[in-house]
């Protein structure tokens, strides 16, 4: 094996091991977060439904009261509902991407 090949293989090995050494910590912390969220969902699945209902009522109340700005005062019921549904879809998409 030539010295150049040996050097390049050594450098490649160093880079790979450094990268691999950083990942387990990230994966471990991510795994802990996923496990804690899964266990909390398993322990209280009803709370998730209640949370969504609460968020929906809160969002509609804020839209009716005009707490989200001047444009929301002029919004029709259909626009309010579409806006809420888009917001919930984005949240679900973000949750799916986090998994």
UniProtKB/Swiss-Prot annotation:
Q: Which domain of life is it from?
A: Eukaryota
| Primary localisation category | secreted
Looking at the keywords, is Secreted present?
yes
Q: Which Pfam family, an example, fits this chain?
A: Svs_4_5_6
Q: Which UniProt keywords apply?
A: Secreted, Signal
Q: GO CC terms for this protein? A: extracellular region
* This protein's record includes keyword Nuclease: no
This entry's comment on induction and repression of expression is: By testosterone.
Annotated signal sequence is 1-21
Annotated compartments: Secreted, Extracellular space
Tissue-level expression: Testis.
Record-stated family: Belongs to the SVP2/SVP5/SVP6 family.
Put simply, this protein is called Seminal vesicle secretory protein 6
Question: Encoded by which gene?
Answer: Svs6
């Amino acid at each position: 094996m030539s010295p150049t090949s040996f050097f390049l293989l050594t450098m490649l090995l160093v880079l790979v091991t450094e990268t691999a050494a950083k990942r387990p910590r990230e994966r471990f912390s991510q795994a802990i977060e996923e496990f804690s969220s899964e266990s909390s969902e398993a322990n209280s699945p009803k709370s998730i439904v209640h949370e969504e209902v609460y968020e929906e009522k809160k969002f509609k109340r804020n839209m009716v009261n005009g707490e989200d700005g001047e444009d929301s005062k002029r919004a029709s019921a259909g626009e309010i509902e579409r806006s809420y549904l888009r917001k919930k879809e984005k949240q679900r998409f973000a949750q799916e991407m986090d998994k």
